[in-house]
Amino acid sequence: MTVGQRIKAIRKERKLTQVQLAEKANLSRSYLADIERDRYNPSLSTLEAVAGALGIQVSAIVGEETLIKEEQAEYNSKEEKDIAKRMEEIRKDLEKSDGLSFSGEPMSQEAVESLMEAMEHIVRQTQRINKKYTPKKYRNDDQE
């Protein structure tokens, strides 16, 4: 079953129309219809909005294995090492700073771990975006 088919099945199970689900997820009805017909592959943020509107986890729409495979396939071993090295640098910088606090209150270990998870997400996003960018001097301009 495709992502679009799962969304449609869950929407019908919840007795929602496309209009109702689109409003709850802040999407246009036509875009939702295109997703359900598998004309578009929705982004993670769109999937999160739809899942939230349906009251389910994103993994219920795409399946846990799909999320893990996509995340693992995105980076090779060198890139994973680079990310791990950068995260260690960030952790050391945070530990060096005197009185790590948020809004004047010292951060708990749980808050620091949460911050590190967010920072890892940022590093991975930046790595992925930079991977897509090709400097102009290296581009193949066949149109000229």
UniProtKB/Swiss-Prot annotation:
Tell me the keywords, alphabetical order.
Answer: DNA-binding, Early protein, Repressor, Transcription, Transcription regulation
Query: What Pfam families does this protein map onto?
Result: HTH_3
Q: Which residues bind DNA?
A: 18-37
PROSITE patterns in the record, alphabetically?
A: HTH_CROC1
The HTH cro/C1-type domain is annotated at 7-61
* Keyword set includes Magnesium: no
Please list the GO terms describing molecular function.
DNA binding; DNA-binding transcription factor activity
SUPFAM superfamilies to which the protein is assigned, alphabetical: lambda repressor-like DNA-binding domains
- The answer to whether keyword DNA-binding applies is yes
**Family matches, as InterPro entries:** Bact_TransReg_Diox (IPR050807), Cro/C1-type_HTH (IPR001387), Lambda_DNA-bd_dom_sf (IPR010982)
Question: What is this protein called in UniProt?
Answer: Immunity repressor protein
Phylogenetic classification of the source organism:
Viruses, Duplodnaviria, Heunggongvirae, Uroviricota, Caudoviricetes
